[in-house]
Amino acid sequence: MPTALEDYQKNFLELAIESKALRFGEFTLKSGRVSPYFFNLGLFNTGKLLSNLATAYAIAIIQSELKFDVIFGPAYKGIPLASIVCVKLAEIGGSKFQDVKYAFNRKEAKDHGEGGNIVGAALKDQKILIIDDVMTAGTAINEAFEIIAKEEGKVVGSIIALDRQEVVNTEDTEVLSATQSVSKRYDIPVLSIVNLSNIISYLDGRISVEEREKMEQYRQTYGASA
């Protein structure tokens, strides 16, 4: 029996569909897989959409009860996410989130002015939450870990908007999704606003039987074990 979606998750999915950030059809992914859905968080590109997106991230973070000092957004997509979610946490998260800081990396290190590779809060001796849109192969978070380790920070978790719950090719004998692989490799929780199971549950009755069957078939073919 699927877990009932919370209001913030329903709102997120509704806006994702309205903005066409979440689309259905036939899409060839970088992996070569043909997916019945495609997710592009970049289409959350208005003040209203960004505010609602930040609320969804913030509620997921608050409910996790994860303790951290800095939200780190890997360049480029993670940069606006880190800043808007930092603001939203201060607005709705109560006193313990008032002093949460944010930071992001430059793609090219700056050799003048303040210099360095990090913009925003210093990462040294800080507990870091990495924020991003999706996690496909885990490449971006691996790079983020290297950057944060170089700055002597400690990653305590990661959060993404959508967990596709798809298997990836790993060196492990286990068949794991990207989020499961990262969680196991770094021993951290990987949070998400929604996952593929949530999408399928939400769409029940909202799409045709044929479209739902394609979603279910895709999950059966590429889905990782819970």
UniProtKB/Swiss-Prot annotation:
Keywords: Glycosyltransferase, Pyrimidine biosynthesis, Transferase
Positions annotated to bind 5-phospho-alpha-D-ribose 1-diphosphate: 30, 76-77, 106-107, 110, 112, 132-140
A GO molecular function held by the record: orotate phosphoribosyltransferase activity
Enzyme class at the top of the EC tree: transferase
InterPro entries in alphabetical order: OPRT (IPR023031), Or_phspho_trans_dom (IPR004467), PRibTrfase_dom (IPR000836), PRTase-like (IPR029057)
Catalytic activity, as annotated: orotidine 5'-phosphate + diphosphate = orotate + 5-phospho-alpha-D-ribose 1-diphosphate
Listed GO CC annotations: cytoplasm
E.C. code: 2.4.2.10
UniProt keyword Glycosyltransferase, yes or no: yes
The protein's annotated pathway: Pyrimidine metabolism; UMP biosynthesis via de novo pathway; UMP from orotate: step 1/2
Subunit structure: Homodimer.
Stored NCBIfam families: pyrE
Function per UniProt: Catalyzes the transfer of a ribosyl phosphate group from 5-phosphoribose 1-diphosphate to orotate, leading to the formation of orotidine monophosphate (OMP).
Protein name: Orotate phosphoribosyltransferase
Organism name: Kluyveromyces lactis (strain ATCC 8585 / CBS 2359 / DSM 70799 / NBRC 1267 / NRRL Y-1140 / WM37) (Yeast)
Lineage: Eukaryota, Fungi, Dikarya, Ascomycota, Saccharomycotina
